[in-house]
Amino acid sequence: MPFTYNVVTGASADRLEKLIAERLGPGADKVAIDRRIWRLFGEKWAVLYTDLSGFSRNVADFGIVHFLQTIYESHRLLVPLIERDNGILLKTEGDSLLVMFRHVSDALRCAVEMQKCTQQYNETRIDEEKVLLCVGIGYGELLRIGDSDIFGAEVNAACKLGEDTAKAHEILITGEVSRTARLPPGSSLQALDTAPAGADSAFRLVYK
């Protein structure tokens, strides 16, 4: 099973570029154009963003081959879970994955399964080979540009939670996720002191 992904832009990106160019023109009705853009590309999705704790430090200490090994292993572990839980892997960036789910409950379930899978994997690995996963999840209206990219406040919030806020083994979610989703069995929420830009609140998912 391959774990390398190539995403090609197409008609959606071309259409968006034309609308943006029109929006930049003199006398453009920006409100009307914005409505057209949202009508064409606006969709509601759950967004899951993963990051690996301590990854950059390990690359500096152990070299590029270690980098490639860790990336490969994380994909090998996580991609089958994404597919099983009805996710769409939109893109990979270094040690991070950007994943979309139609249903928030699928995103939460997948996040818990990811954490349990990597923790089990780590039990038999030396420290520098462990996959220390951080996860952020958002949910809401976003602009989906074909299969090339997504934009929106909840996208930004999910990325901030996963990359900048979450520690190893943590799953952090936005307030919108907490209001929308049914939590996995046996789990609970702990409010965070601060929320990323684009979210009104944020929580730590305490899972079993």
Regions found by a protein language model. Give the residues of each.
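Intrinsically disordered, glycine/charged-rich C-terminal tails and inter-domain linkers
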Residues: 1-34, 168-208
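Alpha-helical scaffold within the catalytic cores of cyclic-nucleotide enzymes
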Residues: 9-13, 17, 69-86, 98-135, ...
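Catalytic NTP-binding/metal-coordinating core of nucleotidyl cyclase/transferase enzymes
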Residues: 12, 24, 30-109
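Short beta-strand
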Residues: 88-92, 127, 194
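Short loop/turn motifs enriched for small/polar and acidic residues
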Residues: 95, 136-140, 174-178
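Short, solvent-exposed loop/turn segments at secondary-structure junctions
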Residues: 99-100, 142-146, 180-181
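Catalytic cores and conserved motifs of cyclic dinucleotide signaling enzymes
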Residues: 145-149, 169-171
